């Protein structure tokens, strides 16, 4: 199934079907604004083109056997951007998911939302919740959209919930462990990311899944998100397959 992922132009080898494909891939979608600026276009055009890449990469990841694809689409820090840009970005998931719902269903994709969703505009939350509900029975790849998400706030939120249980007398402070924190994160039902991909040449996490990526493999590329191709995705998977994950061992 995976041997169709060949870059016939430059001879790139296919993903190795005999080597582990990452179960959970997380991507920081970066470079939409720069993509548009390089072409003398408004930033919103870049964001719209970036949505097309989401369709392409979700389809590729699904066919490769990736189980969870988490996309960092809007962070808790992105609210400081111009209001017109924020409004446009938060309309995109609504338009994308509504138009793509038949394809998502046909490809057995399950959509999930991660983040402080109650702070999102009602129209955004309603649209994503609807698609999540209608795809809940699908058992193909999970498309996990991080909207209004921040890694630090995720940890703080989990810590507060654990503290509430201590106050209620459910357990003592000395009983708190990593598993308890993990059980109260937005990702409590998901495996930690095996591979993080970040586009646009930036070399930082930008407050994304800080707890969950303790042992994730990182892969950075200068390619801007709207230009990110299936071949680029294959390259990231190939690099991952060649690495040895030690988890602190030797």
Label for each model-derived stretch:
Residues 1-250:
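Flexible, compositionally biased loop and terminal segments
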